[in-house]
Amino acid sequence: MSTNKIKIATLQGKWTGDFESNNAWYVEQARALKGKGYDLVVLPELFHTPYFPFEENADFFDLAIEKDHPLVSQWQSIAKELNAVVVFPFFEKRARGIYHNSAFVFERDGSIAGLYRKSHIPDDPAFYEKYYFIPGDTGFEPIKTSAGTLGVLICWDQWFPEAARIMSLKGADVLIYPTAIGWMDSEPKEIYPRQQDSWMTVMRGHAIANRTFVIAANRGGTEGHLTFWGTSFAAAPDGYILEKCSPEFLGVSTVEIDLAETEENRRWWPHFRDRRIDLYSDILKIWCK
């Protein structure tokens, strides 16, 4: 079987305390990849801001940026500079009073290949995202790029198998999850590893069930009462962990994958062949009793 290898770089950083130095850190990490043959660069969720949804505060809407913001243009230029596809998550101001948790995908020439807006919006202690973000209206549409067809989803989307399945059925070669998740300091520390394991397990399950690759890019560091657990990782179509960062790691994690493995896996593990779509109508109900 022929090969289709791509090199992926995932950036795991922490909020530095101010916008200029924070963006400068990510720019420096990305530019260090220049000339090294990377095809895809993935940034964490809301990387350009602090994790502001830890509370409800109308002033934080000022952190949102529009599509023509200089930060967007800068990262389009970086994609061109690196000759790499870039997944660029951002706090999007779509219109007055309309805000999304979004991600652009930039092509190697800096053009916009596509846009995804986060579909599932949490509202939990320290994750009050419903106050800020309108659920996305882009649906689950893979984005075709020169680095493969990307199924971009964002953070809380990772807990919903339907999103991963639809992206895969529509041809995604890789499921990509920019993320901002961690522990609250009020939680008992003995449950920390269990939560982290659940997070990795659910995405490994998506890789296995759909026989596709998964890339998760989480942020690290501590912000107020939240400590983000990092642990960005790449999983193969059989769920095997190809690369994983430590919680404390700050920098670039790299992996090379062969997109042809998806086809090979689906021949040996034909989950899509054996689906019983005639039995699945109940999945569209809120509750089945």
Which sequence ranges carry the predicted segments?
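Extreme N-terminal starter segment of soluble prokaryotic enzymes
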Residues: 3-8
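Short polar catalytic/cofactor-binding loops
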Residues: 12-17
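Active-site catalytic loop in hydrolytic enzyme cores
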Residues: 64-67, 94-187, 191-202, 264-273
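Short beta-strand scaffold segments in enzyme catalytic cores
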Residues: 88-90, 102-105, 141, 232-234, ...
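A short C-terminal boundary segment appended to hydrolase-like catalytic domains
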Residues: 260-289
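Short, acidic/polar
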Residues: 21-30, 160-165
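CN hydrolase (nitrilase-like) catalytic-core segments centered on the catalytic cysteine
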Residues: 64-87, 155-252
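Cys-nucleophile CN-hydrolase/nitrilase-fold catalytic domain and related Cys-dependent amidase chemistry
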Residues: 19, 28-109, 113-115, 181-205, ...
